[in-house]
C-alpha cells in the first residue's frame, strides 16, 4: 500500500499534520474550505516567481492566519513591504475574517519536494532534456543532505509519439515505513507535445516520536541550520 498511496496522507497524525488547521461546524465547513482553496490557488498564481512551497491556513477565533513558505520572500514582500500589503488586501476579499499574513523563508529549497518538482517542470518547459533536469534535481538534493530521492516523469518525453514513464533514484526512499520522514509533491510541465507530470519523493530521515507536528518542527530546525533533535521513543515499553 505504501507504494501507491500519497505518502503525506498516509502519515497524517503520525508525524505529519494538515495544511488547513481549523475546526468548523457543519454549516460553515463547506464555505471555509472553499475559501482555503481559492486563497491557495490565488497565492500560487500571484506569487508564481516566488517559489511557493506550501500555504498553511489557521483560523483562531474570528481570524484567519495565512503562512506562506517561500524560497524567495523578497519577491512577495516587495520594496519596503509594498507588495505584501497589496497581497494582504487581495486575500482579504476571499474571507470575512480578519486576515493575518506571515512569510516564512525556505533556506534549503533543494530539500523541498514541491520546489524540486517545480524546478524540474520549469526546466522541461525551457526545452532542457528531462534526463538532465531529473539528474540535476537529484544530485542537488543529495548534496545538501537528503538521505534519498526519487523523481518520476510521465508523458510524451522528448516528443515521443507514445507516452511513457521514466524515473531516477538515489539513496533510500522507504515509502512503506511510517516513521520515515518523506516529503512528496507533484507538478506539471506544459510543453508543445502536451503536459508532462512530475512527481518527487525526498527521504530526510526517520521520526521515532509519535507527534503530528514532528515534521514541521524538524523542517524548521533544518532550515535554520540547527542540528535536528535526536529521535526519542514515544513511550518506554513495560
Curated annotation (Swiss-Prot):
Residues 212-238 are annotated as: Disordered. PROSITE patterns: KH_TYPE_2, RIBOSOMAL_S3. One of its GO terms (molecular function) is rRNA binding. Residues 212-222 have a biased composition (Basic and acidic residues). It holds the Pfam family KH_2. InterPro entries: KH_dom, KH_dom-like_a/b, KH_dom_type_2, KH_sf_prok-type, Ribosomal_S3_C_sf, Ribosomal_uS3_bac-typ, Ribosomal_uS3_C, Ribosomal_uS3_CS. GO terms for cellular component: cytosolic small ribosomal subunit. This is Small ribosomal subunit protein uS3. It comes from Cereibacter sphaeroides (strain ATCC 17023 / DSM 158 / JCM 6121 / CCUG 31486 / LMG 2827 / NBRC 12203 / NCIMB 8253 / ATH 2.4.1.). The lineage of its organism: Bacteria, Pseudomonadati, Pseudomonadota, Alphaproteobacteria, Rhodobacterales.
Amino acid at each position: 500500500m505504501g507504494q501507491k498511496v500519497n505518502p503525506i496522507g498516509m502519515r497524517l497524525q503520525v508525524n505529519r499534520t494538515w495544511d488547513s488547521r481549523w475546526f468548523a461546524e457543519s454549516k460553515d465547513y463547506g464555505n471555509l474550505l472553499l475559501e482555503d482553496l481559492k486563497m491557495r490557488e490565488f497565492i500560487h498564481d500571484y506569487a508564481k516567481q516566488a517559489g511557493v512551497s506550501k500555504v498553511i491556513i489557521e483560523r483562531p477565533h474570528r481570524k484567519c492566519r495565512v503562512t506562506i513558505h517561500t524560497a524567495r520572500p523578497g519577491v512577495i514582500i516587495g520594496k519596503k513591504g509594498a507588495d505584501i500589503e497589496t497581497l494582504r488586501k487581495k486575500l482579504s476579499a476571499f474571507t470575512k475574517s480578519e486576515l493575518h499574513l506571515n512569510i516564512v523563508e525556505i533556506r534549503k529549497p533543494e530539500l523541498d519536494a514541491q520546489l524540486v518538482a517545480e524546478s524540474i517542470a520549469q526546466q522541461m518547459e525551457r526545452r532542457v532534456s528531462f534526463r538532465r533536469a531529473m539528474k540535476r534535481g537529484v544530485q542537488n538534493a543529495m548534496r545538501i543532505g537528503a538521505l534519498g530521492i526519487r523523481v518520476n516523469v510521465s508523458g510524451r518525453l522528448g516528443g515521443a509519439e507514445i507516452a511513457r514513464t521514466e524515473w531516477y533514484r538515489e539513496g533510500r526512499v522507504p515509502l512503506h515505513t511510517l516513521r520515515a520522514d518523506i516529503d512528496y509533491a507533484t507538478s506539471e510541465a506544459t510543453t508543445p507535445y502536451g503536459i508532462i507530470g512530475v512527481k518527487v519523493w525526498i527521504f530526510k530521515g526517520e521520526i521515532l516520536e509519535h507527534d503530528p507536528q514532528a515534521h514541521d518542527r524538524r523542517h524548521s530546525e533544518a532550515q535554520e541550520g540547527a542540528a535536528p533533535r535526536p529521535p526519542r521513543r514515544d513511550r518506554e515499553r513495560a
